[in-house]
Amino acid sequence: MASITASHHFVSRSQTSLDTKSTLSQIGLRNHTLTHNGLRAVNKLDGLQSRTNTKVTPKMASRTETKRPGCSATIVCGKGMNLIFVGTEVGPWSKTGGLGDVLGGLPPALAARGHRVMTISPRYDQYKDAWDTSVAVEVKVGDSIEIVRFFHCYKRGVDRVFVDHPMFLEKVWGKTGSKIYGPKAGLDYLDNELRFSLLCQAALEAPKVLNLNSSNYFSGPYGEDVLFIANDWHTALIPCYLKSMYQSRGIYLNAKVAFCIHNIAYQGRFSFSDFPLLNLPDEFRGSFDFIDGYEKPVKGRKINWMKAGILESHRVVTVSPYYAQELVSAVDKGVELDSVLRKTCITGIVNGMDTQEWNPATDKYTDVKYDITTVMDAKPLLKEALQAAVGLPVDKKIPLIGFIGRLEEQKGSDILVAAIHKFIGLDVQIVVLGTGKKEFEQEIEQLEVLYPNKAKGVAKFNVPLAHMITAGADFMLVPSRFEPCGLIQLHAMRYGTVPICASTGGLVDTVKEGYTGFHMGAFNVECDVVDPADVLKIVTTVARALAVYGTLAFAEMIKNCMSEELSWKEPAKKWETLLLGLGASGSEPGVEGEEIAPLAKENVATP
């Protein structure tokens, strides 16, 4: 454990107000190791002065590597790319929200297209399917030298690598979902700067020192010709360390970094005096230097990890086109990084969803399986099962609304509760499922006391119930103040449950008014108060949706929802195009394939 601790990081909320009729425009694009034997080498810090010429060697597929004359900084991969995703969450091993879902779903989709893909995340728990590689490296964290180890498993065509260190395992063990960033919701670990500095350095070592042989197509270390995809502020040091520790010593000269913003409200702002803890040259200080205009836990001049990640990376991406448009539109929407993003530009690509876990035809949590041809017969039966499960009067004719999400201001759960009091007098039932802030949990649990035959609030983490609500509800309410992409609406549409959503971020990109759902308009993102205008938007839109319930038009909307392509296949193609644009000479676009890589060995852990 490092002896120096850092200050708290804070959360900043954007303040978004959208015109839902505005034209959606495409956001512009901007334009160290010692040689090791097997899996048992220890890589010293001073080994950065040496480099290995080891290249990835294929087992079954040819992979010609030729240099393009005059392009020494161009990645040379032959066919496919070497992609390294780095993040603090990767589903299903660790997940608190959309970040874990993306790192769980996008990498297999890219692997299925013929690329070699690795994910790197902390080992928060003793994952039973990940084995110790026996490879250890040393990294400098603050003023101490720390040894980290790597665990590995190979699933769905992806090398899943986990960074093992007490900073992760001893804090979080046993309760990954609730303790990744702090001991409880809203409270962060004091040493998060050090924890994620360690993660970034370990991630830069892994492609070069891990001799992985689980794939039918690739073997050996990934080498130095790689593309790093850094996700959110926790990994923003990757481009900085890449330049200062590696490329300055002639290592990773061809490597590039794409930085993906999943939620700009979380930026990693710390006291300016903490910069020396990062062990970066002074030339990087300007990229971190930041003075905010809001009242924040850390007073005065600060460092901003996300700002540095944006400025030092080769490409900036976010999780939907409309969210990208919001981020560059104003200081409140970009949470004071709008001007930086306008300078660098940002690309939005909508997320996909896990169509294997969320599949009404095979869902293990529902008694009735269905598809688009049988949905109209199945939904009433599933509604009755849901009503019985939560203790509401069983009546397949009454419209039922669901809400699934974190109980916090961003997700609009406080606005929802205020609105329920207004529309509960209509012919409707509602089931609310979520965990989060205690005051919000108490509010939803009071719903069944106030409206015993109309409402049910469940303040627990309950995966089976989430699936039952998604399948059995007629509508899914998504009242987010801001939503970079959102997954609940995708799950709902997959099951023929019509979204009623706020008009923000990815909700604008994925839900079509009157075709696959109902838009309520944009909400005031000031989190300290519930705006009566937003409550009215929910009430009026719910009434509008209920007026359509049971009609032929509603049946058509259900089928429209289920006809949408929601998997990771299309997003993976767009990600592939973007990453190829970073200069992967000799690489080729992938091929059509299933989300599980064809012929890949499944569930193979490193021996």
UniProtKB/Swiss-Prot annotation:
Source organism, top-level taxon: Eukaryota
CDD domains documented for this protein: GT5_Glycogen_synthase_DULL1-like (cd03791)
Known EC number: 2.4.1.242
Reaction(s) this enzyme catalyzes, per UniProt: an NDP-alpha-D-glucose + [(1->4)-alpha-D-glucosyl](n) = [(1->4)-alpha-D-glucosyl](n+1) + a ribonucleoside 5'-diphosphate + H(+)
A single BP term in Gene Ontology: starch biosynthetic process
Main localization (coarse): plastid
Keywords of this entry: Amyloplast, Chloroplast, Glycosyltransferase, Plastid, Starch biosynthesis, Transferase, Transit peptide
A molecular function GO annotation: alpha-1,4-glucan glucosyltransferase (UDP-glucose donor) activity
Key word Chloroplast present: yes
Localisation: Plastid, Chloroplast; Plastid, Amyloplast
Name by which UniProt lists this protein: Granule-bound starch synthase 1, chloroplastic/amyloplastic
